[in-house]
Amino acid sequence: MSKKIERKDRKFKFETLQLHVGQESPDPVTDARAVPIYQTSSYVFRNCDHAAARFGLADAGNIYGRLTNPTEDVFEKRIAALEGGSAALAVASGAAAITYTIENLAQQGDHIVAAKNIYGGTTNLLEHTLPAYGITTTFVDVFNLEEVENAIRENTKAVYIETLGNPNSDVVDIEALAKIAHKHKIPLVVDNTFATPYLVRPIEYGADIVVHSATKFIGGHGTTIGGVIVESGKFDWEASGKFASLTEPNPSYHGVSFTKACGPAAFVTKIRAILLRDTGATISPVSSFIFLQGLETLSLRVERHVENALKVVQYLNDHPQVEKVHHPSVATEASQQELYKKYFPNGGGSIFTFEIKGDAQKAKDFIDNLELFSLLANVADVKSLVIHPATTTHSQCTEEELLDQGIKPNTIRLSIGTENIDDIIQDLDEAFKAVQ
C-alpha cells in the first residue's frame, strides 16, 4: 500500500492556495474556520525578555498594530504564495506600496528607470514628488530594450514597469527587462495590479519585487483601499553591492543587517521595521479581512472578467464608430502578439482603452450616455466601469506624456465587469446610438 502524502508535502494549485494559505487549520483559539479580525492596537509580552526579543527581531511575533496584525499576516502569507514570493507586506494603499518600495531602494542622489506607460499617479510620484527628496527618474520606452539599458546609470537602483501598461494594457517583456536589470545588479520591480497572479506571476520571469493595488482585482468589489509588496527572495542584495541600507548595520535599528537577520524576507522586513514604523501607512485588520475574502474568489472573478472583456474587445473592434481598440488580443504589432501569447495564454486585460471616432466631446458624450457602466476613478470592480483618462486619471500629465502613454482626447478607458455579457454590450450599443 502506498504511503499517504501529508498535506504539508502536497503541491496545491492556485485555486486551492487562494483559499487556504496562512490558515491551514482553524483558528487555534476559537476554532473559527474563517480568519478572525484581530481588532487590537497592541499585544501583551510574557515578560521583559520576551519583549526585548520581539523588538530585536529575534522573535518574529507581534509588537504593535502599526507594524503587524494576525489578520494581516494571513493576507500577506496568502498573496506571497499566490505570487510565488518569499514574503509580503500589506499597507494602506497601492500608492503606499509603490512609494515604500522606491524609498526602500533609493536614497538621496539615486536614480530609477521607469516605463513611460505606467499609472499616472506613479508617474507623478517619480517625476514630481520624489525629486524633492533627491531621487530622480528617467522614463523610457519599455519596448525599446536598448533605450532601457542605456538609461541605467551607476546610481540607478531599480527598473520599474507594469505587467500591463496603464491604460492601454500593452504587454511588456518581463523576462527581457529582468535580464537587463540583473546585468546591472539592480532589481526589477513590477506592478502586477492589472494582471493579477492568476494570469501571470512576474517572479517566474525574473521580477524581484511585485507590487499591487489590492483595491483592484484582489478586493474586487470596490469597497476597500489597500496595497501589497511581495519580495521574490531571489535577488542577492549583498552581491549587488548597491544596497547598504539592507546589507550593512542599520543605525536606526540597533545595528541590524536586514539581509543577515532576515534572509529572503530582508526587503519587506526593512520596510516594516523602518518605513512603516516611521511613516505609518498601515493596513487595518478589517481591510485585510476583506482582501482575504476577495482572494478566495480571485480566480473565478478574473476568468469571468477576461471572458467578458474579450467579447467586448471584439464587439468594439468591429464597430463602425470605433477608431481603434487598444488590447493585446487585437494588437496589430507582431511583437505584442508574441508577448501576449507568452505571458497571457489564458487571456488578459479586462482594463483597456479605445478611441471613438470624433473629438474629446464625442468621447465624453458617449460616456455620459452609458447607464450600466459607472463613471468613477477605479478599475477591476465586478461592476463595469468607464472613465475619460485625459481629463481625469492622467489629467496632470503634459501633452507629451499623454502621447507617450497612448492617451488621446477621444480615448475612453473601460474596465469590464462580471455582468452578463449581453447586458454589457447592449449598454455600449445604446451609448453609440445616442452619439452617432
Regions found by a protein language model. Give the residues of each.
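N-terminal glycine-rich, Lys/His-bearing helix-loop that initiates the first secondary-structure elements
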Residues: 1-59
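Conserved PLP-enzyme active-site core in the AAT-like
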Residues: 2-10, 22, 26, 87-318
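Conserved N-terminal alpha-helix of the aminotransferase class I/II PLP-enzyme fold
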Residues: 47-96, 121-128
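PLP-dependent enzyme catalytic core of the Aspartate aminotransferase-like
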Residues: 2-4, 86, 127, 136, ...
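Positively charged, small/polar-rich N-terminal and surface patches that mediate targeting and assembly
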Residues: 7-21, 70, 230, 380-381, ...
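Short, acidic Gly/Pro/Ser/Thr-rich loop/turn segments
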Residues: 26, 44-48, 236-237, 298, ...
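Short amphipathic alpha-helical segments
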Residues: 60, 86, 287, 291, ...
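Conserved C-terminal alpha-helix-loop-beta "cap" of PLP-dependent enzymes
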Residues: 302, 310, 314-317, 321-412, ...
